[in-house]
Amino acid sequence: MAKKVVIIGGGAAGIDVLELLHRGKDESENLQITLLKKEKEGFFSMCGVPYALQGMYSLGVLDHFRPDFYQDKGIDFRTETRAISINLKEKFVLIESGEELLYDCLVMATGSKPFIPPMPGTDLKGVHTLSSRKDGELIASALSAGEVNDALVIGGGWIGLQAAVAFSKKGIKTVVVERLPYLLSTLLDQEMASIIKNYLEQDIVFMLGETAEAIQGKDHVESVLIGDEEFPADMVLISAGMRPDVDLAKNAGLEIGQSGGIVTDQAMRAQKGGLPLNNVFCLGDCAEVIDAVTFRPRLSQLASTALIQARVVAENILGAGSSYGLCLSPTVANISGLQVGSVGVTTEIAKRYGISIKSGTSVRFTKARFFPDNKRIIAKLIFETSSEKLIGAQIISEETVAERINELTLGIKLGITARDIWMRERCFDPSLTMVEDVLVDASVRSGADPSTKR
């Protein structure tokens, strides 16, 4: 008999599991895969939407595969289909039509949904979030129609900043309001975040440490109240974070953790009553995992993390046996030409969890000083005091940030120290790098003694 696999969710996490199962199964294996997706499109790359809004390409290029691409492979790929409930005992998923879909293995990839701050006016026309293709289309339509003169973004995270750049590039007066004292506070320390603010504030007004109190207007948004001051706005983007979509899991009795995500074990299995369920897996935005530095529960709402988790889920369904391990969640983004990357803990997060640290910041160049078209690069490295192991990194430059963050992610996993960075052989060509790299200089500036053998 065929092994029935039902995947709930058709974002990056669900699609990754589907494709890995389809590619990884042995010819003798008989898998019957059903994917339930509430949206109407096949595979749409949400990560690319902010750049489409900036005019780099159309939203249409983000449609990677239509539903029939998967259906032609024998996959029961259902769009505009909602799961209503899960019966863990009888092993079936009830969908809106009343059909009961039996499963041998269930994959929860239900994603996340925008957090809407409790304030008046969030239902007015012209107020948007950015978490779906439809959201992107509505914003793009308003921008192309020339309907927006003043835009206000609530939230100073990746999506909010990238959207603000898109608005300002179209000549729109743009304000970003962030309740915390600096931008990207879960990823960067304040002095690093200030570099981004200084880079952008020629075109964007930042209201930091402020809270939007109300969105005002009759039918369409007209202004936003921040403290006692009223800011004109004919478009508002609420980008105040994403919350795991766990209603279905919670109603089924699956455990929801401290982070708000579905509790998982190392095999990405969901849990009930403190025990893992061998045939129910969870991954992506809705999954709670364990942080590799703090060892506390956390979320990692990144497509890149979801891909690794999907490999674990697919291998376990196929019987290979696989473990996810601890989560580092390396991130990188392009903010108006400035590449910003982060991995591990910030000094603030380390302080919150009582981790004693040393840190060093270096400003260098991406190439030899004499080489044309040189770019400045700023790196901050954070080490645990007693072991001098690397536990965090933040890098800002116009180039080479992603590859450096990937390198340091592996370094944290392997437990490298400041001395390891200082003593490691590195390649050199003046057109590509400096003899003494910015990471080496940052490790020395941390105060660790690289001359001491360990």
Locate predicted features:
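Flexible, glycine-rich terminal cap/loop adjacent to redox cofactors
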Residues: 8-13, 20-29, 38, 240, ...
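Glycine-rich dinucleotide-binding loop and its adjacent helix/turn
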Residues: 110-170, 206, 264-266
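Beta1-alpha1 glycine-rich phosphate/pyrophosphate-binding loop at the start
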Residues: 2-76, 165-188
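A conserved FAD-binding loop/helix module that cradles the flavin
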Residues: 283-345, 433-451
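Short hydrophobic core segments
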Residues: 101-111, 232-241, 310, 388
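FAD-site-proximal beta/loop scaffold in flavoenzymes
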Residues: 123-147, 217-223, 230-315
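A Rossmann-like FAD-binding core segment of flavoenzymes
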Residues: 27-34, 71-95, 100-101, 169-266
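Rossmann-like dinucleotide-binding cores of NAD(P)H-dependent redox enzymes
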Residues: 63, 150-151, 158-214, 300-305, ...
